[in-house]
Curated annotation (Swiss-Prot):
A motif (Cell attachment site) lies at residues 43-45. Coiled coil: none annotated. It comes from the Eukaryota. This is Disintegrin CC5. It comes from Cerastes cerastes. One of its GO terms (cellular component) is extracellular region. Gene3D superfamilies: Disintegrin domain. Binds and inhibits integrins alpha-IIb/beta-3 (ITGA2B/ITGB3), alpha-V/beta-3 (ITGAV/ITGB3) and alpha-5/beta-1 (ITGA5/ITGB1). GO terms for molecular function: toxin activity. Homodimer; disulfide-linked.
Length: 65
């Protein structure tokens, strides 16, 4: 494999030591985005979805307006 992801340990294919994540809507530059960062803008009667600061996933909001 010639082009390794900068966040990925090429042997384990997991985040390198000191890095939090490899990819995802709440991952940037190998780190989780801050809690409260919008990861999915509201549409229609839905509300924004926000990063938690502990995961690279974008959890669905639990509330509807």
């Amino acid at each position: 494999m010639n082009s390794a992801h900068p966040c990925c340990d090429p042997v384990t294919c997991k985040p390198k030591r000191g890095e939090h994540c490899i990819s995802g809507p709440c991952c940037r530059n190998c780190k989780f985005l801050s809690p409260g960062t919008i990861c999915k803008k509201a549409r229609g009667d839905d509300m924004n979805d926000y990063c938690t600061g502990i995961s690279s996933d974008c959890p669905r909001n639990r509330y509807k307006s």
